[in-house]
C-alpha cells in the first residue's frame, strides 16, 4: 500500500476515537510527568523482566464500518428458527420504547453499580420496581435486585438453605422435573462446597432427610400442580424449600409464596429481554423475611437523606464480599442490573392487566395446540399446564423432530417425547405451521379457540389459579402510553450520573468508552433470536465468533485455551479455582486446599476461595504495597503439603507493577501450587505483558472492564477464564451440547452471556495489536499525569521503584483527615457538586481514594478532575484554618441539590454559588444530585425493600 493510501485510510481511525488524549497532547502530559517520551514512561513503569519481547500477533485494526460488515457476515451464519424449546428461555417482544431508551441508551448502560446513591436514584428506583415486581409475582416478602442466571440463582438458593435452615443434614434434594441446566450448576456448586445432591421425583421428598429442596413450578416438562402439601410436609422435617418459577406463569398461577415456599428463584428473561443464545438475563430471588440478611446479591432499600427526604440505596452491604470477604454470603459482585431494569420497565409498561393479557394469550395458544393434538390422537404427558406441552411421540419422535426442523421449527427432544413451549411472540399462523408438522393440516385455529375458550383455564387446576392481586403499586398502573413511558424513563435517567456526564474515575473498575459501534450488534436479531439449546448447526455464527474471540484472548493473555461460560468476574474466579482443584484431584492431590491471598486482594478472591472449600491464608503486604516476600516464603513453607494456589492481581490492587511477580509464581510452583492471576487490572497489561508470560496458570478477564462491555449500572458482566494447557481439560463443561464434556457447568448456557460477546470482539477487531497496546500505554500515561498533578496536594500511597504507578493510584486521605476532620467520603460527595462520580472509596486501603482515569478520558477532562480535587483540597484547608466550621462546610454538607439552591433559608458560612457551582465548568454543564447525602445507618435499621407509597414520589 502506498504511503498516501495509508495516510488516507480509515483502518486506524477508531484508535484515536477510543483513546482520549490527542497525540499532540502527549508531550504536555509527559512534561508534567517528567518523561521525554511515552516509551520512556513505559520503561520506567513496567519492569523489564515481564515486558513482552515481541508484539502480539493480532490482525491489523479495522475501521468501524469494516468491522460491522465483517461481524454482520458472522451473524448471518446463524439460523433463526421458530423456537418452541422453552426450558427457561422464550422469545419475547422488547417494547421499542424500552429498546431505544434503555438498552440502546448510554445514559443507562454506561452507569456504574449504584454505590454512590446520591447520583443513582433513577436506576435505584428501577431496581426497586424490579424487587417489587418479583415480590408481587412470587408472593414472598423480600427480593434482591438480580442474580446472574436461573441456574446460579438455584445454586445460591441451595447455600442459602444451609445458612438459613436448622437441619443438620448435608443433602440437598432436586426434583427430577427441574431444568437440566439448573441441576448441572447445582451439582458443581454442591461438589465443591461439600454437599450431596439427591435427584428424585418430588413425591418422594418426604422419604429423604435433606436440608433443602428445589422444585420447579411449572415443571420443565410443563406440569402444573399444587405444591402446598408437599412444602408443608418438608417443613416438618426442617427442610427449606426453593421453588424455581416463571414470572409470566405467576400472573395466572397461584404464587409459590402462597404455597409456603421459603425461596423463589427464576429468570426474568421473558419480560422483554432477547434470548441471545443464553444471555445476559436477570435472574431473581425472593425469600421469607427471616432469611433476608443471608440472601445473596444486591438489595435496594428505602432510606432518607440528610434533610429527611426519601432516598434509595443499596441495603445490607455488610453481608457482601467487599466487606466480609471469605465470610460473605456469596462472591456475587456484578449482577444483571441493566437487564433487571428492562424487565421491571416491561412490567411497568404493560401493567398487571397487560401482563394478564399476554399470559392468557400464551396459555390459550397452548390449550389450542393441546386440543388439536389430542383430537388427532396424540397423548400428552400432563393434562395441567401453562405454556408447555410434552407430547408422547414414541417411535415417531425422530421423524417429527426432523420434520419440524424442515419447517424451520425447533422442538425440545426427549427420548420418546417432544416438548413444545409457547411465548408472547407466537401467532395463529405459527400454530397452523406447527400443527402441520404433526400431520394436522390447515388447522382451524379459530374453531379450536372457540371450543377451548368455553373454559379458558380448564388446563390449570382450580386450586392452582391465582386469586390474589399483584402489581398494585401506582408505578405499575400509570405509564401505559408510550408518551408516559418515555417521560418516565427519561425522568429516571436524568437522575443518574453516567459516562455521558463525565469521567467515572473508579479505581479497579476501568470505566472506559463503550463505543456505539461495539454496542450496535447487541440488538441484531441474528444474535438476539437464538435459543441457547438450539441445534449447534443453527448457531454457526456464534461458534465462529466464540472461536475467533477465544483465539484473540489467548494471544493477548499468553494462555492456551479459554472458556467463555462464566457470567461475571466472580463466576470466572469460581470456575478458575475449580479448574485448579480438579487438576490437583486428577494428580492424587485432592488434599491441597490452602489458598494464599495477599491482604490487598479484592473481596471476591477470599469469598470465591471459600466457595470451593479452600482454607484462606492471608499474605502480608510490605510498606510499598507489594507482597511481603518473607511472609510469603514462611506461609508457603508452613502450608507446602496442602498448598493449592495463590491468587494475585497484576498490576497489584495497590496500583503498581510488582517487580518480583515472577519470583512469586516460581515459589508457588516449586511448592506444587498453581497461580491464579485475577484479571481485574488487565487494562495495564494488554500488549506490554501477559498473565501467561508472567507465569500464571489461570486468570479470568473482566470483559466489562478491559474489553469494553459496559457496566450497565451493575451488570451485565462477563468473566471468561484462560488457562495453560495442563488446566484445559478442567474448564467448565455443559449438559446441553457436550462441548468440553458434560460436567462442572458454572452457568446455565455454554457461552454464558453470549449476546454481549460481539462487544469485546468488535473492540479487539477495531483496535488491532497497535491500538490495544497504545490504549494500555495511554491508560498508564493518564494515570501518571493525574498522580503528578495531585501529588503536591495529596499524599500518594504507593508508587513503583521509579516513582511511577500503573493505571491507577491511591490517594491517602488519612493524614488529611487527622489535620482537617474531612473524610474520604466527604471528598467523594463533594466531587458530585463538581460534576464527577467519586473514585473508589476505602479500597484496597481504608481511608483512601483510588483513581483510575482509563485511556478514554481526554486531557481537558483529566484537568477538570484534577482542578476539582485541588479546589477541594483548598476547601479542606479553610476548614483546617477555622474559616469554615467542621460541622458546617461545603464538604460535610455535600452533595448540594437544586432544592438547596432555591431554599428560602441558608444558614451556611459559604455562598450558594460555592455550594452548587464550585467551578466554572460546573456552571457550563451542571449535573445535579437529586438527593442530599443518604443516611446508610437509618436505611439498614429501618429496612424497607419495596416500593414506597405514591405520596413519597411527589415532588
UniProtKB/Swiss-Prot annotation:
It holds the Pfam family GDC-P. Its EC number is 1.4.4.2. It catalyses: N(6)-[(R)-lipoyl]-L-lysyl-[glycine-cleavage complex H protein] + glycine + H(+) = N(6)-[(R)-S(8)-aminomethyldihydrolipoyl]-L-lysyl-[glycine-cleavage complex H protein] + CO2. Disulfide bonds: none annotated. SUPFAM superfamilies: PLP-dependent transferases (SSF53383). One of its GO terms (molecular function) is pyridoxal phosphate binding. Belongs to the GcvP family. This is Glycine dehydrogenase (decarboxylating). It comes from Aliivibrio fischeri (strain MJ11). The lineage of its organism: Bacteria, Pseudomonadati, Pseudomonadota, Gammaproteobacteria, Vibrionales.
Amino acid at each position: 500500500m502506498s504511503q498516501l493510501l495509508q495516510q488516507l485510510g480509515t483502518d486506524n481511525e477508531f484508535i484515536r476515537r477510543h483513546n482520549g488524549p490527542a497525540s499532540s497532547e502527549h508531550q504536555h502530559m509527559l512534561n508534567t510527568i517528567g518523561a521525554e517520551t511515552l516509551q520512556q514512561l513505559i520503561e520506567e513503569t513496567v519492569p523489564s523482566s515481564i515486558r513482552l519481547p515481541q508484539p502480539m500477533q493480532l490482525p491489523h485494526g479495522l475501521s468501524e464500518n469494516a468491522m460491522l460488515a465483517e461481524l454482520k457476515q458472522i451473524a448471518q451464519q446463524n439460523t433463526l428458527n421458530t423456537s418452541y424449546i422453552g426450558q427457561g428461555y422464550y422469545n419475547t417482544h422488547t417494547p421499542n420504547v424500552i429498546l431505544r431508551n434503555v438498552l440502546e441508551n448510554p445514559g443507562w448502560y454506561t452507569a456504574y453499580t449504584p454505590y454512590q446513591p446520591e447520583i443513582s436514584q433513577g436506576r435505584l428506583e428501577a431496581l426497586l420496581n424490579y424487587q417489587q415486581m418479583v415480590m408481587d409475582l412470587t408472593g414472598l416478602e423480600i427480593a434482591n435486585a438480580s442474580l446472574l442466571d436461573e441456574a446460579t440463582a438455584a445454586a445460591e438458593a441451595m447455600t442459602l438453605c444451609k445458612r438459613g435452615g436448622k437441619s443438620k443434614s448435608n443433602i440437598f434434594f432436586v426434583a427430577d422435573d427441574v431444568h437440566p441446566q439448573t441441576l448441572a450448576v447445582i451439582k458443581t456448586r454442591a461438589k465443591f462446597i461439600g454437599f450431596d445432591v439427591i435427584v428424585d421425583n418430588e413425591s418422594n421428598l418426604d422419604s429423604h432427610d435433606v436440608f433443602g429442596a428445589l422444585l420447579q413450578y411449572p415443571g420443565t416438562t410443563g406440569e402444573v400442580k399444587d405444591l402446598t402439601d408437599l412444602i408443608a410436609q418438608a417443613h416438618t422435617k426442617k427442610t427449606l424449600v426453593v421453588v424455581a418459577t416463571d414470572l409470566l406463569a405467576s400472573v395466572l398461577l397461584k404464587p409459590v409464596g402462597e404455597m409456603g415456599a421459603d425461596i423463589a428463584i427464576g429468570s426474568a428473561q421473558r419480560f422483554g429481554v432477547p434470548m441471545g443464545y443464553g444471555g445476559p438475563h436477570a435472574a431473581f430471588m425472593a425469600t421469607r423475611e427471616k432469611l433476608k440478611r443471608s440472601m445473596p446479591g444486591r438489595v435496594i432499600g428505602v432510606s432518607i437523606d440528610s434533610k429527611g427526604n426519601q432516598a434509595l440505596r443499596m441495603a445490607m452491604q455488610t453481608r457482601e464480599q467487599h466487606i466480609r470477604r471469605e465470610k460473605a454470603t456469596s462472591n456475587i459482585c456484578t449482577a444483571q442490573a441493566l437487564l433487571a431494569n428492562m424487565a421491571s420497565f416491561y412490567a411497568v409498561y404493560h401493567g398487571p392487566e397487560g401482563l394478564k393479557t399476554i399470559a392468557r394469550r400464551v396459555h390459550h395458544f397452548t390449550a389450542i395446540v393441546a386440543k388439536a393434538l389430542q383430537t388427532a390422537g396424540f397423548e400428552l404427558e400432563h393434562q395441567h399446564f401453562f405454556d408447555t406441552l410434552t407430547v408422547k411421540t414414541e417411535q415417531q419422535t425422530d421423524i417429527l423432530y426432523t420434520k419440524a426442523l424442515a419447517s424451520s421449527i425447533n422442538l425440545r427432544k426427549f427420548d420418546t417425547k417432544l416438548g413444545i413451549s409457547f411465548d408472547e411472540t407466537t401467532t395463529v399462523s405459527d400454530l397452523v405451521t406447527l400443527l402441520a408438522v404433526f400431520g394436522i393440516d390447515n388447522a382451524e385455529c379459530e374453531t379450536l379457540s372457540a371450543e377451548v375458550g368455553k373454559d379458558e383455564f380448564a388446563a390449570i387446576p382450580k386450586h392452582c389459579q391465582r386469586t390474589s392481586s399483584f402489581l398494585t403499586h401506582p408505578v405499575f398502573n400509570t405509564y401505559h402510553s408510550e408518551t408516559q413511558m418515555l417521560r418516565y424513563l427519561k425522568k429516571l435517567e436524568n437522575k443518574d450520573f453516567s459516562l455521558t456526564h463525565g469521567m467515572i474515575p473508579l479505581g479497579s473498575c476501568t470505566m472506559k468508552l463503550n463505543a456505539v459501534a461495539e454496542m450496535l450488534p447487541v440488538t441484531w436479531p441474528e444474535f438476539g433470536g437464538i435459543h441457547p439449546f438450539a441445534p449447534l448447526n443453527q448457531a454457526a455464527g456464534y461458534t465462529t465468533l466464540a472461536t475467533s474471540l477465544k483465539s484473540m484472548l489467548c494471544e493477548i493473555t499468553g494462555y492456551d485455551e479459554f472458556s467463555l461460560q462464566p457470567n461475571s468476574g466472580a463466576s470466572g474466579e469460581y470456575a478458575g479455582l475449580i479448574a485448579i482443584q480438579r487438576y490437583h484431584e486428577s494428580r492424587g492431590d485432592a488434599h491441597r486446599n490452602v489458598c494464599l491471598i495477599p491482604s490487598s486482594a479484592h473481596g471476591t478472591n477470599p469469598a470465591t476461595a471459600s466457595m470451593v472449600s479452600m482454607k484462606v491464608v492471608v499474605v502480608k503486604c510490605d510498606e510499598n504495597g507489594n507482597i511481603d516476600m518473607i511472609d510469603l516464603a514462611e506461609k508457603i513453607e508452613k502450608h507446602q503439603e496442602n498448598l493449592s494456589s495463590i491468587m494475585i492481581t497484576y498490576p497489584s490492587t495497590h496500583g503498581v507493577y510488582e517487580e518480583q511477580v515472577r519470583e512469586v509464581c516460581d515459589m508457588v510452583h516449586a511448592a506444587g501450587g498453581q497461580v491464579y492471576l485475577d484479571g481485574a487490572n488487565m487494562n495495564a497489561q494488554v500488549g506490554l505483558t501477559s498473565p501467561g508470560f508472567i507465569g500464571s496458570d489461570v486468570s479470568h478477564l473482566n470483559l466489562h472492564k478491559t474489553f469494553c462491555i459496559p457496566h450497565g449500572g451493575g451488570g451485565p458482566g462477563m468473566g471468561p477464564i484462560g488457562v495453560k494447557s495442563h488446566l484445559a481439560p478442567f474448564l467448565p463443561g455443559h449438559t446441553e451440547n457436550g462441548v468440553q464434556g458434560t460436567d462442572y457447568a458454572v452457568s446455565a448456557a455454554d457461552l454464558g452471556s453470549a449476546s454481549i460477546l460481539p462487544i469485546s470482539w468488535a473492540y479487539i477487531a477495531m483496535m488491532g495489536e497497535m491500538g490495544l497496546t497504545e490504549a494500555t500505554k495511554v491508560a498508564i500515561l493518564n494515570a501518571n499525569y493525574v498522580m503528578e498533578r495531585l501529588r503536591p496536594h495529596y499524599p500518594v500511597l504507593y508508587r513503583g521503584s521509579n516513582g511511577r504507578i500503573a493505571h491507577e493510584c491511591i490517594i491517602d486521605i488519612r493524614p488529611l483527615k487527622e489535620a482537617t476532620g474531612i473524610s474520604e467520603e466527604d471528598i467523594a460527595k463533594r466531587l458530585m457538586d463538581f460534576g464527577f462520580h467519586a473514585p473508589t472509596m476505602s479500597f484496597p486501603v481504608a481511608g483512601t481514594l483510588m483513581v483510575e482515569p482509563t485511556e478514554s478520558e481526554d486531557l481537558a477532562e483529566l484537568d477538570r478532575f484534577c482542578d476539582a480535587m485541588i479546589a477541594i483540597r483548598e476547601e479542606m484547608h479553610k476548614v483546617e484554618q477555622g474559616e469554615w466550621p467542621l460541622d458546617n462546610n461545603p464538604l460535610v454538607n455535600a452533595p448540594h441539590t437544586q432544592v438547596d439552591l432555591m431554599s428560602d433559608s441558608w444558614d451556611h458560612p459559604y455562598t450558594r454559588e460555592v455550594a452548587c457551582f464550585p467551578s466554572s465548568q460546573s456552571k457550563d454543564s451542571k449535573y445535579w444530585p437529586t438527593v442530599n447525602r443518604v443516611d446508610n445507618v437509618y436505611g439498614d435499621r429501618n429496612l424497607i425493600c419495596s416500593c414506597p407509597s405514591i405520596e413519597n414520589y411527589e415532588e
